[in-house]
């Protein structure tokens, strides 16, 4: 009997369409957070890459009666720092947990979302891009995490209902010490620009 109840509960949760899964890939940029936001994105001198998988759960739909959805999210990332000979490690892993809000714009039978997330990031080693930022600056595995994104519903674009709520987009992964508030990291940090595929289910 308990297995039947567990199955029914699982099916009910799936039917609620409250989950998200995002696969992203990108590169480090030498641009600051502000520069990336205004579209001034410069390639880093080294080919540092990231591959990440983020899962989310919808906490509130249309929060405050606005077209804004709130998710709690967690992610795992792999950073490839092998392009830098002095890297502390060629393979570095990251875990993140954060709250993210999406502002929804519905027009022309499609949906565009602007997303902003805030949370924490922990890496298995110090990222090479952070070591190169300022070699005299304090470093930390544990830093503040910001996730900014813009995407559109690919399923609606091609008018294929089974792929509705499948988003293609651009995201920024940002780690920093918030000007010294976290572990005395004042000017270090990293920015990675990524493209991604995200599915709500």
PLM features: what roles do these ranges have?
Residues 32-39, 82-88, 126-132, 180-185:
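Outer-membrane beta-barrel translocator domains and adjoining extracellular loop/strand segments
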Residues 23, 53-57, 97-103, 116-118, ...:
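Residues on the lipid-exposed face of transmembrane beta-strands in outer-membrane beta-barrel proteins
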Residues 15-60, 198:
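Short glycine/proline- and aromatic-enriched beta-strand/turn motifs that initiate or cap beta-hairpins
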Residues 15-18, 60-68, 104-113, 155-168:
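Short loop/turn motifs that connect adjacent beta-strands in outer-membrane beta-barrel proteins
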Residues 21-23, 70-74, 114-118, 168-170, ...:
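Membrane-embedded beta-strand positions of outer-membrane beta-barrel proteins
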Residues 25-31, 57-59, 74-80, 118-124, ...:
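Transmembrane beta-strands of outer-membrane beta-barrel pores
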Residues 30-33, 145-201:
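Predominantly the C-terminal beta-signal and adjacent terminal strand-loop region
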Residues 17, 47-51, 89-97, 110, ...:
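Residues that define the transmembrane beta-barrel architecture of outer-membrane proteins
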């Amino acid at each position: 009997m308990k297995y039947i109840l567990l199955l029914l509960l699982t099916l009910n949760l799936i039917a609620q369409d409250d989950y998200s899964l995002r696969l992203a890939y990108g590169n480090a940029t030498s641009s600051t957070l502000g520069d990336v936001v205004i579209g001034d994105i410069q390639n880093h001198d080294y080919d540092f890459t990231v591959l990440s998988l983020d899962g989310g759960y919808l906490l509130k739909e249309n929060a405050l009666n606005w077209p804004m959805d709130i998710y709690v999210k967690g992610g795992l990332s792999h950073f490839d720092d092998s392009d830098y000979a002095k890297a502390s490690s060629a393979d570095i892993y990251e875990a993140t947990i954060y709250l993210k809000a999406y502002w929804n714009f519905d027009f022309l039978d499609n949906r565009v979302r602007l997303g902003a997330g805030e949370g924490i990031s922990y890496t298995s080693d110090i990222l090479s891009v952070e070591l190169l930022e300022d070699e005299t600056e304090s470093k930390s595995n544990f830093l503040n995490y910001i996730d900014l994104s813009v995407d559109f519903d690919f399923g609606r674009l091609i008018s294929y209902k089974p792929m509705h709520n499948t988003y293609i987009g651009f995201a920024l992964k940002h780690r920093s010490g918030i000007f010294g508030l976290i572990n005395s990291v004042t000017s270090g940090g990293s920015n990675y620009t990524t493209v991604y595929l995200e599915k709500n289910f």
